[in-house]
A protein has these predicted regions:
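Acidic, small/polar-enriched beta strand-loop surface segments
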Residues: 139, 152-244, 251-291, 303-309, ...
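Short, acidic/charged, Gly/Pro-enriched secondary-structure junctions
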Residues: 1-8, 37-68, 98-110, 257-280, ...
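Assembly/oligomerization scaffold segments
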Residues: 1-89, 178-183
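Short, basic/aromatic beta-hairpin or loop at an interaction surface
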Residues: 18-32, 234-250
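Short solvent-exposed strand/turn elements
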Residues: 40, 74-90, 293-313
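Short, conserved beta-turn/loop elements at beta-strand boundaries and strand-helix junctions
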Residues: 66-71, 285-293
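Charged- and aromatic-enriched interaction segments used to assemble
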Residues: 73-186, 345-350
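Extracytoplasmic
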Residues: 17, 30-32, 58, 72-74, ...
């Protein structure tokens, strides 16, 4: 493991590691570094960690756990990058006409996290966030922007800063069965299928079905798998319903020679004729394994580049409905005051 170095609070260590695993995934998973080593203890909980390979710094994080085995000299620790703090902290917020970048900076500011590269703001956001994680709150802001421009956003940590990146960018990697793929697998499932969305609207406390968006072919072939969504003003409800449809889920795994460019959220090229995996695929998760003098990657592929989304309750509408009911009750009380007790109001009105 000559090419591999780990810095603990700035101090360099090498040639003591028996196994190092560097991993990550799309959809809000912080990148993780797991290390096994021999010799004296080199870490404490909370220590700053930098991991480099071939003098390229790949991971910045903090030690969350360390351990040792009494019968051997083997010690171990694992660390997460800074994005873990977005998952580990919940907030009570109420945003009104705020830009996504303002929401991002507010959450990161409270967590003492730096903000790195972010896209240009195209929308404003109004929503309450009660007992929601920092990740969910930021994700919801960029989901609102996604509904307008259809770009797919991911929240990642790069060099200790929180970046908002466009998911699916192609990286210069080609995996082939002839050169660098050891094993591969492919499967299909309808476990999470959604082939019809019912769009409804609540008006005067009555529900009204407005539209149905369907995948007719999947309905005919597999039966009905239905979900509902509430109509929203000023958004393309049909397009959003189409986004919710889920067809046959395809998944694939590749075990290949290591390459640091293979990371979750990026697309890579694959030519593997035995499983039919030929083309460009999004990396859903990646696990890089360094052991002895070997370096391999275990990759899960995604067949659709879709935005991670979280459902927030629309408290605004609930409040409006409560106010309407309160006004009606108040008006009724005032009319009742005009009539003495025991009078027949209907008869009097005639």
């Amino acid at each position: 493991m000559e090419k591999l170095k780990i810095y603990v609070n700035g101090k360099e260590y090498k040639n003591i590691f028996t196994r190092v695993i560097w991993s990550g995934a799309i959809y809000g998973t912080a990148r993780k570094l797991e290390v096994e080593y021999l010799g004296d203890i080199i870490t404490n909980i909370g220590d700053e960690i930098i991991f480099s390979y071939e003098d390229e710094k790949l991971f910045y994080g903090k030690v969350f756990q360390h351990s040792r085995k009494g019968e051997t000299e083997l010690k171990s620790f694992y660390a997460y990058d800074n994005s873990i703090y977005l998952n580990k902290n919940n907030f009570v917020k109420n945003f009104f006409k705020k830009k996504p970048s303002e929401i991002l900076k507010e959450i990161c500011g409270e967590l003492n996290l730096k903000v790195g590269k972010i896209p240009q703001d195209e929308v404003t956001c109004t929503y309450p966030a009660i007992d929601r994680s920092g990740y969910e709150i930021i994700l919801n802001a960029y989901t609102i922007q996604h509904r307008k421009n259809k770009k797919i956003y991911s929240i990642v940590s790069n060099e200790q800063a929180i970046d908002i990146v466009e998911q699916g960018t192609y990286t210069d990697v080609l995996l082939t069965s002839a050169d660098n793929i050891s094993t591969s697998s492919y499967e299909e499932s309808i476990e999470n299928m959604i082939n019809q969305i019912v769009i409804y609207k609540v008006e005067k406390e009555k529900q009204q079905i407005l539209y149905k968006v369907e995948n007719a072919e999947d309905k005919k072939k597999f039966g009905l798998f239905q979900q509902v969504m509430e109509y929203e003003k000023d958004v393309d409800n049909i397009a959003n319903a189409k986004d919710m449809l889920k067809s046959v889920e395809k998944s694939a795994r590749i075990y290949c020679l290591g390459n640091i460019l293979i990371q979750a959220g990026y697309s890579i090229g694959i030519q593997e004729p035995h499983t039919g995996l030929i083309g460009s695929f999004l990396v859903k998760s990646d696990t890089h394994i360094f052991e002895g003098e070997t370096y391999f990657c275990n990759i899960e592929l995604a067949f659709e580049n879709v935005m991670d989304k979280v459902q927030f309750e629309n408290k605004e509408k609930a409040k409006k409905n409560k106010k309407k009911r309160a006004k009606k009750a108040k008006k009724k009380d005032k009319i009742d005051e005009l009539f003495p007790e025991g009078w027949d109001k209907k008869k009097w009105a005639n």
